[in-house]
Amino acid sequence: MTNIRKTHPLMKIINNALIDLPAPSNISSWWNFGSLLGLCLIMQILTGLFLAMHYTPDTSTAFSSVTHICRDVNYGWIIRYLHANGASMFFICLYIHIGRGLYYGSYMFQETWNIGVLLLLMVMATAFVGYVLPWGQMSFWGATVITNLLSAIPYIGSTLVEWIWGGFSVDKATLTRFFAFHFILPFIITALMIVHLLFLHETGSNNPTGIPSNMDMIPFHPYYTIKDILGILLLILTLLTLTLFSPDLLGDPDNYVPANPLSTPAHIKPEWYFLFAYAILRSIPNKLGGVLALLLSILILVLVPMLQTSKQRSMMFRPFSQLLFWTLIADLLTLTWIGGQPVEHPYIIVGQLASILYFLLILVLMPTASIIENKLLKW
């Protein structure tokens, strides 16, 4: 008799995706982050669901309802902080996952890569609308500043902003619709994630060498299930350590002050995971230019497969490209730091130089280095 997991219509799908899936025998721990992202998504949906049971999306009670969750709901404090810090873990895994894709040339699976970029945009949108919900000072002013950027769009800008606000300022209507978006987006992300996996399983996984591994595959279970469990345990340990020892480490103290449209915080800044893009936005002394640079800083990922000039897929055997890749990482860390600093003398110029270098590395320097490496292969 054939095994039920190979014949049952539903079990068959799970079997082909998680059990009998042929996987390259040499994929490293950098390939763990896909499953960790799935775990983060499940965790965020579950903690978010329990938070939504007690939260009220109304300007007069939103802040109080979050306080009520932390003080009066059984284990409400840990659910709230797991959700807030879970978002940070989500972005850490996301950025490492993208970095892995860039380093090892996984972007050559174009459909998988493009859906991945779409997933990134969706997760960023979800995190942004979610940050508005506690209705603290940074929630309110962050929402005001970022939605206001749309007014830079010629002709329809101001109408668009008022349409998103549902009025003439960020108010009750804005909070209600942001809560609705924050609830629906994770389910759209889940659907996209399934499509992402569908396209990945059409081609099979890449591996650190970038060389096809069709002749050397091993079953996903037990090898990579065990490996993933180790990653999951480390992720949960990190998240629990952060949540139980310093839950507010990555948050902004200003968000413990209820939203007040009459008082602007000294420094308006988003959560740490948006700071690199925020720094690029601020580096351009023109509203429309800044908005375009902000968009391009993310959408440039779509161009990466088209900029592939190397004969080798992975950077494993390309020292020049490796140097430029790590320069890009250092540049992104610099931008993240600049985004959190006030707009003052040394920071402005450093931010502008880091922004120029970011685009220069991806669009010019890395493709050029690849061409030079191709020539060196002939020596």
UniProtKB/Swiss-Prot annotation:
The membrane-topology field of this record reads: Multi-pass membrane protein
Share an example GO biological-process annotation for this protein. mitochondrial electron transport, ubiquinol to cytochrome c
Q: Which PROSITE patterns match?
A: CYTB_CTER, CYTB_NTER
Give the subcellular location: Mitochondrion inner membrane
**PANTHER family in UniProt:** CYTOCHROME B
Anything else of interest in the record?
A: Heme 1 (or BL or b562) is low-potential and absorbs at about 562 nm, and heme 2 (or BH or b566) is high-potential and absorbs at about 566 nm.
- Subunit field text: The cytochrome bc1 complex contains 11 subunits: 3 respiratory subunits (MT-CYB, CYC1 and UQCRFS1), 2 core proteins (UQCRC1 and UQCRC2) and 6 low-molecular weight proteins (UQCRH/QCR6, UQCRB/QCR7, UQCRQ/QCR8, UQCR10/QCR9, UQCR11/QCR10 and a cleavage product of UQCRFS1). This cytochrome bc1 complex then forms a dimer.
Put simply, this protein is called Cytochrome b
- Organism, by scientific name, is Neophocaena phocaenoides
Designated gene of the protein: MT-CYB
